[in-house]
Structure formats: C-alpha cells, structure tokens
C-alpha cells in the first residue's frame, strides 16, 4: 500500500487544486511536481496551490524531468502513488464514470431526455468513459467531443485504455460501435490561446446566463457548441469542466 502521493501538472492546474483539497482532507502526504515557469505569478490556481500546500510540497522541475515525471517521482520516493497530468490514469476511470449515472439521474429527476451530449476534452479520459458507457448501456446518445487539447489519435488512445480497463473488470461491449464525433474549437484553436473575442464572450455569458467560464476550456466549449449546434438547444446537454477558479488568473485580460 502506497503511503503518499506525487502528482504532476502546471502551476495553474485545475486538477492539482482539487487534488490538494482531497489529499488534505484525508491527511495524505503529497508532493506536486510543477513544470518550471519563469513568468509565474501569484495569481489564479497557483495562488490557491500556495494556500493548500506547504513549501516543501511544491517542487519545480525542468522540462526533461517533466516529460519523464513518473520515473522522476519514483526516484524521489519508491513508496509513492503517482498521478500523471490531468489524473489521466486507470485509477480515475471508476470515478469519472459516475458522471454518466449522475446525468441519467438528472434526466429522470427533471423528466428530461437530452439526446445530444457535448463535452470538452483535454486528456480525453472523461470523454472516453462517457463514450464507452454510452455504448455499453445502449443509451443511444449522440456524443460530440470538442478537443480543447490533444488530437484524434490521443483520444483514440484514451478510448482504448478505457475499454481495456472495463474489460479487465469483466465488462465487455457486444460490438465496438461508438456513437461520437470529434470537433476542434472554432476560436482560439491553439491550446492556451485567448483571443479578445473569447474574453468578451465570457463577460457576456456571465451577465446573460450567470455562468462563469474560463478562457482555456469552458468558454471555447460553449462558443464552439453554439456555432456548430446552435439550432439543437432543446435536447442538448453541454458538459463542461467549470472554470470559476481559473478565471482569477486572467484578470488582466478583462475590462480593457
């Protein structure tokens, strides 16, 4: 049994903030490996990480070590559980799969039938689990995935690993016909890019809908969904990864 946790990510990672909260709650020892950033500022998620972590729990590593982070982590401590960037590991699949069952419960509770599910993808693991369960449970939902990061090959790799996980646990598809399509952002196509138009979109969306979006993931998801599927609002569900915390890191981009 591993006694502590080492995770890797960027200094502004949403994933690390959430992970730090859980590990602190359960009193699990941790160390976060952050890729070196010469322009880092005490804003956004990095500010939250500093609140949640002791100085010795945050360690900056160079790009070479970051690319081989698992071996680097194991050399630091053999008795550790390693969590890769974005928690893209098989141990996360059971948890992320609950998303589908939560949605189905909401459909039942609110007497809705969302026939078209739209969600973003970074590492693609959550989206892959949704696609797999849609096939396994024969939900017949149309799944549209907006690839904020990664590409078609990386998503297929995530889907392969998700299928492998379920097979190892005794769950098999009668056939491997997946009902999904991949799309890419129609604005700010490069990961991390923030055109002024998306900043204005976030401001308008907050005022008109009361929902806070971030410029990296959720805003591009909604913007792209509107442009691709604007006429399908009635039975469409957009599943996004939040972003209110991350917004604090982009204050200087707003209200110019």
State each model region's role:
Residues 1-22, 26-35, 113-123, 142, ...:
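A short, small-residue-rich loop immediately preceding and capping a beta-strand
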Residues 12-19, 123-130, 219-222, 246-247:
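Short glycine/serine/threonine-rich phosphate/pyrophosphate-binding segments
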Residues 14-63, 153-165:
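Active-site-proximal loop->helix
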Residues 30, 56-58, 82, 143, ...:
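Hydrophobic beta-strand scaffold residues
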Residues 33-35, 61, 83-86, 120-121, ...:
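Short beta-strand segments
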Residues 35-110, 179-201:
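Small/polar-residue-rich loop-to-helix segments that shape phosphate-bearing ligand pockets
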Residues 93-181, 240-256:
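Glycine-rich phosphate/pyrophosphate-binding loop at beta-loop-alpha junctions
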Residues 178, 183-234:
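Active-site-adjacent helical/loop segments in soluble small-molecule enzymes
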């Amino acid at each position: 049994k591993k006694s502590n946790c080492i995770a890797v990510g960027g200094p502004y990672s949403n994933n690390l903030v959430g992970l730090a909260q859980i590990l602190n709650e359960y009193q699990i020892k941790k160390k976060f490996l952050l890729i070196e950033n010469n322009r880092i500022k005490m804003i956004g998620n990095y500010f939250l990480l500093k609140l949640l972590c002791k100085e010795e729990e945050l360690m900056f590593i160079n790009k070479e070590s970051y690319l081989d982070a698992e071996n680097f982590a194991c050399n630091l401590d053999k008795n550790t559980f390693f969590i890769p960037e974005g928690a893209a590991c098989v141990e996360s699949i059971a948890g992320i799969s609950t998303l589908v069952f939560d949605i189905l419960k909401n459909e039942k509770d609110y007497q809705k039938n969302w026939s078209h599910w739209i969600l973003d993808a970074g590492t693609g693991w959550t989206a892959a689990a949704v696609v797999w369960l849609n096939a396994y449970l024969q939900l017949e939902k149309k799944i549209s995935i907006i690839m904020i990061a990664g590409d078609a090959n990386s998503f297929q790799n995530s889907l392969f690993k998700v299928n492998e996980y379920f097979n190892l646990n005794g769950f098999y598809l009668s056939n491997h016909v997946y009902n999904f399509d991949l799309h890419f952002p129609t604005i700010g196509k490069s990961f991390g890019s923030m055109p002024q138009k998306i900043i204005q979109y976030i401001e308008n969306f907050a005022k008109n809908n009361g929902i806070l979006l971030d410029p990296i993931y959720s805003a591009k998801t909604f913007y792209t969904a509107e442009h691709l599927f604007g006429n399908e609002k009635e039975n469409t569900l957009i599943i996004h990864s939040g972003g209110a915390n991350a917004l604090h890191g982009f204050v200087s981009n707003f209200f110019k």
